[in-house]
Structure formats: C-alpha cells, structure tokens
Amino acid sequence: MQVEAVGSGPRLVLLHGSGGNSGWPAQRPLAERYTLVMPTRTGYPPNPPLERIDFERQAEELHEILEPGDHLLGHSYGGVVSLLAAASADLRSLAVLEPPAFGVAGHHRAVAELVSELRPLWPTDLPPERFLRRFVETVGSEMSVPSPLPPEVEASVRAMMVERAPWEAQIPFDELAAAPFPKLVVSGAHHAAFDAVCDVLEQRLDAERAVVPGAGHSIPRAPGFTERLEEFLRRARSGALADARHRADRPPSTG
C-alpha cells in the first residue's frame, strides 16, 4: 500500500472504501492535531493494478502499516478491511463507517435485497462508467459520476470491479469484542441494509453508535461527521470511553 502522511500528533489511519483514495478532504483539518496516515489500498492507483483484490490480504497489508496506539478509521470496503486487521492490532480506537459486511445481517430483508442487487456486479462485463453509476445508485452514495470518467477515476473503478465481494467476510466478533480499545460504528441514515449491519456491529462489538445523515453512504463528507469523529477520538485518548456508549445521539433506524 502506498501511504501519505500529513500533520503531527497521534496517528489516525484513514482507510478508504471502493472507488479509490480521495485524500479525505473533509478530515484534513484534523492534521492540526493528528498525524493523518492515508494508505491507498493495493490495486488502486497509483499502486499497480491487480487481477483480484481480497479483503483478507489487504487486512494483512494494513496490519503491516499499523503501529501500537494508532486510531483506525475505515470507510465502506475499507471498514471491512479495518475490522479484520483490528482483531489482532494494538489500537487506541477503531471507527468504521458503513462497512458492507452484509454477511453479519444476512437474515435482514433489506440486506438480502441489497446483496441481490449488488451480486450481478461481481463479476460483470459492464464498462467502468456504467458499473460505477449502477453501484452508486444501488448503495446510496452521494458521489457525482463524471462522463467520461477521468483516467484516474476509471483506474479506480477497474480496481473496484475486481474486489472480492465484501459480504463474504467473516468478522472476528469474539476477538474484536475482547479488544480493550473503544469502537465506533457510524451509519448515514439512508438505507435499511447498512443500518442493519451497523446495528449488529454495535451489539456484537459493544460499540458506540452514531448516525450522521446528509451524505448517504459518503459519510466522510456528511455535515458534522468530522466533529463527531474528533469528539470520539478525544475521549478515546483520555480514556473516557471505558463506560460511555453515547447511543442517545442515534435517531430511529430507517428500517
């Protein structure tokens, strides 16, 4: 994984989802107080392309980057990778944003329906632009799809098209629940399937839960998210999360 680091202070590792590393623009102000460590997952530019991208292999690669005491934040597919890596990592905190670990809530009707809509995309012979439009519409992302796709975006979409389906991931609940660091699970109040996954993660990991509406699946861009994240990080650093769960800030589920 190619890694960019900016800022100073405790390390906050930010792992992007499908679609590539956009550089986390809304979180850049945190570089005044944290060292932002932003890996680009293998297979995504500027890394060389791969024929197949696997979350288990990427969890191993992420583990090589992590250092004791890191804060780890994973969005979407990067959230699945982060959950796998965190099970054996010495972290200060873990936050995941709508990880598509749909296997943990496969009994939920909305999850089963969403997986049935996504399954035809892996594999597919759709051209990259049509693939991206269909994916964005299906998962509820607020991403604007340009036409034609710029070369760097097309390269990221081609990487996305060879990712292993994230609902195949086996989340190590026991190890994560036993880990001493606090956990935060965030959803975007836009799709019952992601709500269901996040609800299971909250319960099984004894995690703090937050809902940040306003940007669909593109939670890093949601109004108020960066402030909510920093509040969690601040309490994690001070050790104030031993008993606090702050679930009262969660509005009703969308389904």
Question: Which residue ranges define each predicted feature?
Answer:
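Conserved alpha/beta-hydrolase catalytic His-Asp/Glu region
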Residues: 125-161
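Short beta-strand immediately N-terminal to the catalytic nucleophile in serine-hydrolase-like folds
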Residues: 72-74, 97
